[in-house]
């Protein structure tokens, strides 16, 4: 269950929520994959807010990369022409950790009969990111597009805020937005310099779907 959430705030306290080939590139342009982009080291570069098009052959993973110069809200869009056929692309988003290592951030099986898919908003730190695309069945041989949509904003969570030591700061009277993925706790913190009455507002868009957020407020007994 993935939904946008927000905070409004009116002793240090913590809040936990669970729920490559070289191209001359300019944002907003259109690009095409260059084979063989079959692993992260040969990933095709695509600037944020631009689209790169590719075609998966059988047993042919395609890798793409984009970079963020500073923390940003990112939505990766995977687009194609919908068809009533049995085909699927396996799309995975990774963060590059350096030294040949990368961490999975999100993934989705995108079916040909479902149409274009946009990943939920992610608040990501500056760095290099990869998108891996692998097609099966009727998805092979069909063109798709990958667009890393990016907005440089300061009011979104920054992954990976998965523990109290990496908690995102909250400012009083300001709203901060985030998205919980499966098994992805989000932590936030705010600090009081003197005793005060504080209310924490947790807001989201109402839906008839079956979902729940577990929201816990903690008092930190250590200096962080």
Where are these regions (language model features)?
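Extended, low-complexity, turn-rich repeat/linker tracts enriched in Gly/Pro/Ser/Thr and Asp/Glu
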Residues: 80-88, 138-140, 204-212
């Amino acid at each position: 269950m993935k939904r946008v959430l927000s905070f409004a705030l009116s002793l240090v306290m913590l809040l936990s929520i669970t729920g490559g080939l070289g191209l001359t590139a300019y944002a907003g342009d259109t690009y095409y994959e260059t084979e063989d982009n079959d692993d992260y080291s040969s990933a095709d570069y695509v600037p944020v807010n631009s689209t790169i098009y590719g075609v998966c052959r059988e047993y042919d993973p395609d890798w793409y990369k984009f970079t963020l110069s500073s923390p940003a809200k990112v939505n990766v869009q995977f687009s194609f022409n919908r068809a009533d056929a049995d085909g699927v692309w396996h799309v995975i988003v990774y963060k590059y950790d350096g030294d040949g290592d990368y961490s999975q951030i999100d993934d989705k099986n995108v079916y040909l009969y479902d149409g274009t898919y946009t990943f939920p908003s992610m608040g990501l730190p500056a760095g290099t990111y990869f998108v891996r695309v692998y097609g099966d069945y009727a998805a092979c041989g069909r063109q798709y597009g990958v667009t890393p949509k990016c907005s440089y904003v300061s009011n979104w969570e920054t992954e990976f805020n998965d523990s109290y030591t990496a908690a995102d700061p909250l400012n009083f009277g300001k709203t901060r937005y985030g998205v919980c993925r499966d098994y992805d706790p989000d932590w936030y913190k705010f600090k009081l310099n003197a005793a005060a009455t504080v209310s924490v507002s947790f807001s989201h868009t109402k839906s008839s779907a079956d979902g729940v957020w577990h929201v816990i407020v903690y008092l930190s007994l250590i200096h962080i």
